[in-house]
Amino acid sequence: MSEASLERGIAALKEQIDAPVAAFFSSCTHCGMCADACLFHTETGCPTYTPIYKVEPMRRLWEQEYTLLGRAKKALGLSKPITEEELEKWQSKVYNTCTLCGRCSMVCPVGNDITGMIRKMREGMSAGGFAPEGLIGASERAVEIGSPMGVRLPALKAQIKHAEKDTGLAIPMDVEGAEYLVLLSSMEIMNYPEYLHAITRIFHQAGKTWTLCSEAFEATNSGIQIGSSDIAAELVGRVVAAAEKLKVKTVISPECGHAYTAIRWEGPNLVHKEFGFKVQHILEVLDELRAEGLLKTEGIEEAKLTFHDPCQLVRRGGVVEQPRNLLDMIAPNFVEMEDSGVMNWCCGAGGGVSANEDADKVRNKAFNRKKKQLESLDIDVVVTACANCRIQLEDGLEINEMDIPILGLTEMLAEHLKEDKPVEEETS
């Protein structure tokens, strides 16, 4: 690592220290409540995993550069400078033991957005070259190929062909003027192609027009995860360009938490303009179809099941009631987890953690919190609405020898679609 890289990292951290961050540092009471809200701390007992401590280099930089006391301490040699070795050491704290889930921010008694501070810390780490190799590779593939997993258009077309054969329905691509532009995540394309089958059947029944885009089918945003606003903006910009080119009314984010955060909440700020279209998560769209009588189901799931709330979708995205409204249609034996909804515990693999191989050990330890939640319910099935959560849940349950299937909510609903004719589309 060159000195220039360290300088870039420090310069980037300085740029992130705005008025809100300064206020957060000034108002922190060191109460420790954020530690009790973080599953990496609760499941390991490691004090350095306390959320606010993960931004300690940035706090010290703020103190040294922007406070009178800090400048005096620095001049007297009482406050050590930030070094390359320190930032290398901090990489695991910032990237491996934080999923940006937002639970710490929820419990802060003075309202500090600790999650936002850690995101800003990642901006400096990324700019200085201190990001983990796994996320660097994912980000490079996202920019160069269009997918963090390296999924190219031919792979998607192969899945489309299978879905069309299984459903007997045509899947539209690059159709101008459709109501919905549907985005997918690489995980859904490669690991859970049944999601594509499900939305194809659901939109057909509802009589809705939709399309995929060959130039922007990927929803995952590695820029958000690694902490690079430039990369995040480029990836969002591709989706915006596709939506504008195809003149769609709504862009639908898939069952992926950070994809929703990127395009729905951070997107306009990243590209510096208001969208000329709506952005919704697939569950928001399905709940609207339910309310309009366009999502018709039959039969029920007799199994006792629960719902794992994806952090970015529920806690940070506000999509709380929609999945429960949808479950009420088909799941009479649905039970809530303790600490559900906006206070649910993270799966332990979001925010780019799953991309870092050296995070596997601590990630598996963090899963113990979810394990305890599930054991207390004695349920038969777990339903969720995030492909990354789904993979982590499947891995964690397998490691802990817990035989509980994991299902996506969209697919479950599609399995219960009432077989009738689609609503006739309005003609102009």
Predicted regions located by residue number:
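Cofactor-cradling patches in redox/metallo enzymes
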Residues: 187-275, 312-329, 335-428
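A short, charged/proline- and glycine-enriched loop
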Residues: 175-180, 299-305
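Short cysteine clusters
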Residues: 28-34, 38, 98-104, 108, ...
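Iron-sulfur-cluster electron-transfer modules
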Residues: 8, 15-25, 55, 59-269
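Conserved beta-strand elements of the Class I
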Residues: 181-182, 306, 380-383
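Active-site glycine-rich loop that binds ribose-phosphate moieties when present
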Residues: 233-239, 285-293
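Iron-sulfur (Fe-S) cluster-binding segments and ferredoxin-like electron-carrier domains
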Residues: 36-65, 106-125, 318, 352-366, ...
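Long, charged N-terminal interaction/targeting segments
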Residues: 8-51
